[in-house]
Amino acid sequence: MKAWGFEYKSNLVWEKVRKDGLPDGRGVGFYFRNVTELLLFGIKGKNNRTLAPGRSQVNLLRAMKREHSRKPDEFVALIDACSTGPKLEMFARGDREGWDMWGNQADESYEPTWKTYANHTVATVKMSA
């Protein structure tokens, strides 16, 4: 983060769960079947204090997996409520109004291809038939 000019502030832990709410043990990992993923939260510039909702927000979110590398939309609402921005998602898939999106699939033409995960989020991106 520092190399990109950001100051690390905290992390958000995404606990990947199945439809029944139990841990999704299909994660990858050589030593463990990882059911969590860390999202790093950083800022640029001075006087970028977290908004009041962020000071009472726990850093754990339980949500179902989506297609490879795509984060749950639930994180967007959480970050929007806790930070004034501007906002950036690195290694993103798709685009999002009010955010800068960086990644080789970070544009409006991106569409999920894994129908398995079509119902796993509050996503606004529609799946093709």
Which residues make up each language-model segment?
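Class I S-adenosyl-L-methionine
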Residues: M1-A129
